[in-house]
C-alpha cells in the first residue's frame, strides 16, 4: 500500500505489536532489478519503522533473511556470526534493514526483533521458489533447472513452523534488562534490539529434496544440471538455540512431511 494508506491504518488502529513481513524477495531477480529491492525492502522497512516510532509500539518484529550470512563458512549459522559478506543485492537490502532498525532502536528505544528466515516453503508460497518450480516442471514433464549440479544444501523450513516461531516471539520483546541472561545472545548492548534465526536446523541435500518430490508425485524429473548462479550460496544451516531459550520454540516439520503437505495443497489448488 502507499505510505498514506499505511499511515491512516496505523494511526487509526494504533497497534501495540507490528509484524513486518512484506518484501521483494528472491536472489536472482534482485540482480536484474536492484532498484525494486532498494525501494521495497529498504524504503518500505524504513516507512514501517518510522510509523512504529510515532505510535510507540511495544514490539516491532521484522522479517530478515538467512541470505545475510552470505559467504559465512561457520556452520550452523548463529545470530552472533559476522555478516559482512552478502552475495546478492537482495541479501544486502536485508542486511541494510537490520542496520537501520538497530539505529532506530538505539535512538528511540523501539523494541525490535529481526527474524532471519531460512528457505521458507509450503502452501501459498512464491511461484518462483524451488518447490513450486520443481513440482510444476515434473508434473508437466518439463526439464527442471538444478543449479551447481545439485551440490547444494538448504535449511528448508516449513511455513507453519515459521508462523509458530514468529507468534512465539510476539510477547518476548528485547530489553536491555536481559543483557547477560542468555548464552550467545544477539541482543544489542546499547538498544532493545535482537536478531533471531527461524530455521529447521537441518541441511537438506538438494537432490534428496527433488527425489522426495518425485516419490510423492510418482514421476521422475527431467533434469537440467547447471552451474552455480550469481548470488547463490551453496549451503544454509541455522542454529536456533536462541529462539528455543527465549520463546521455548523449535521448528519441527521434517522436509518430507512438508513436501507431502505442500503437494496435497498444490494438487487441490491447481486442480
Show where each model-derived region lies.
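Conserved sequence/active-site signature of Rossmann-fold short-chain dehydrogenase/reductase
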Residues: 68-69, 120-122, 152, 162
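N-terminal Rossmann-like NAD(P)+-binding domain of SDR-like oxidoreductases, especially those catalyzing
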Residues: 1-120, 249, 253, 260, ...
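Hydrophobic alpha-helix immediately C-terminal to the catalytic Tyr-X-X-X-Lys motif of short-chain
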Residues: 96, 100-104, 134, 209, ...
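C-terminal substrate-binding subdomain of Rossmann-fold SDR/epimerase-dehydratase oxidoreductases
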Residues: 138-271
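Short glycine-/acidic-enriched loop or helix-start segments at secondary-structure transitions
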Residues: 29-30, 71-73, 124, 156, ...
